[in-house]
Structures are given as C-alpha cells and as structure tokens.
C-alpha cells in the first residue's frame, strides 16, 4: 500500500511516517501545498493523510484538485484545526 503524508509539522510528519513504515507501508511525504500538489498530480496513492493548514495553500484546495483529476485516493484529514465548516467541506470533497 502506498501512502502520501502531506503535513507541514516535521515532528508529526516523521512520527506518522516511521509508524507506517514499521508496518511495511510504502510512504512518501510532502511538507507544503506545492510539494503535495506535485505528488498528487504525478503519482497515484492508496491513501493520503492530509493536513488542512499548509504553507502555500490549504489541504481543502488539494482535495478540490484531487476531485478535478478524478482520482480515487482515500483521504484522511489530519489537523489540529477544529472548524465544523472545514470538516463539512472536507467530507463534501471526498475525505
């Protein structure tokens, strides 16, 4: 299973990456909006772990781009932001 982690906080990103790799998942990472955008446009993943607040743009914008590309990756939002509006929009966009 190939997983993409798009998270700007290095400690959290590395913790998730190590945990998944320990379970033998293939993991790629991106630390900002543009790096994440490049990866979702170029590659296919089984699952994307996506932060909402990213340098350069939002995770919700990346969800919109996935929808435009008609990609079917499973998306799990990981965020400290606790906005009901963001949760609803994320679900509407396929997370």
State what each model feature region is.
Residues 1-95:
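N-terminal/domain-start alpha-helical segments
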């Amino acid at each position: 299973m190939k997983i993409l982690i798009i998270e700007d906080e290095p400690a959290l990103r590395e913790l998730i990456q190590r945990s998944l790799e320990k379970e033998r998942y293939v993991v790629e990472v991106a630390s900002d909006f543009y790096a994440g955008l490049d990866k979702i446009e170029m590659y296919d993943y089984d699952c994307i772990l996506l932060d909402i607040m990213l340098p350069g743009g939002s995770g919700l914008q990346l969800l919109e781009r996935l929808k435009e590309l008609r990609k079917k990756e499973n998306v799990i939002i990981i965020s400290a932001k606790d906005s009901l509006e963001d949760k609803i929009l994320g679900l509407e966009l396929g997370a």
